[in-house]
Amino acid sequence: MRTITATLLACLAFSIDAADYRANEVANGFQIPWGIEFLDKQQMIVNEKNGTVSLLNIASGKQQTLFKVPNVNTSGQAGLLDVALVPNTAPQNPQVFFTYSKRTDKGNTVALATAQLKNNQLVGWKDVFVADAITDTSRHYGSRIAFVDDKVYFSIGDRGERDNGQDTQTHAGTILRLNLDGSVPQDNPFKTSEARPEIWSYGHRNPQGMFYDEATKQLWSIEHGPRGGDEINLIRKGANYGWAKVSQGKEYWGPLDVGEAKSLPNMEDPKLVYIPSIAPSNMVVYRGDKYPELDGKILAGALKLAHINVVSIENGKLTESKRLMENLGERVRDITISPDGYVYFSTDTGKIFRLEEK
């Protein structure tokens, strides 16, 4: 059992001078741009919560509707969620993956879908995998996508039911790992057990951020805690991340701790805990020369406290080091890195910004 690297955040002086960075607005008018992904230096796919997949030209600002996702539920936290380009895909007809909240006859769940972009049209849309994560709530869907060694990973929240976190008979509260065709890899940790074979890790509450750092070969996730207790986790094969037996947060209705303990044997401790919560969205590990001060650091979007959270990684320990864009007053929904090394982020007011040094 490892020691938790926790950071108590109560209006501490982490803010960077506003003169160091600025947000350059490159587009607006989207309906909650939940996921953004570059096709090349000039073009970006934008997932809007209402089910619209759009194409944005960064230079001109031109927006084009590519596709309207069928059977998408948009109530509450549901909607069209993440978008991710398959690495090393054919540039002429790139393959793209999506997650979304899918309506079914039994209720709403999370689905992983794929399509190809041909002649500025999204074609061949199909569900690769529909999760068994149906509840009657409209919250905690996750969901983010990452690719590692020709496998696709995607996260699913506990769907508003705490017991799902420790129940490996459901896909809710997990990170799943699949082959690109939706089949189960032979080396998945629960392939031969009674648990769902698609599960890579479990015990998650609502992981809305995930990023694979190619430089270190590490898969990171960030998830919402309850009242306090947001977490950054280093994702390991077959690991249990504790929810809801373990939590650093408190009940919404009172000052009582959530769960049985803050740490338990055989459950992974988070690498960083946010108290109070920042309500994290997506995250990246920045590698590049456009912002020398940020190289090798985690950048995470914050919804509740409306900023970009900068986290240093030193000898395996995580420490919050800075907060960027606090004066912008925007809920940061997604964050990504362009092919030429610039950080872009989307906000719930329908805008997309580029982070720039002054």
Q: PLM ranges: what are they?
A:
Residues 1-8:
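Sec-dependent signal peptide recognition
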Residues 9-17:
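Hydrophobic h-region of N-terminal signal peptides that target proteins for export
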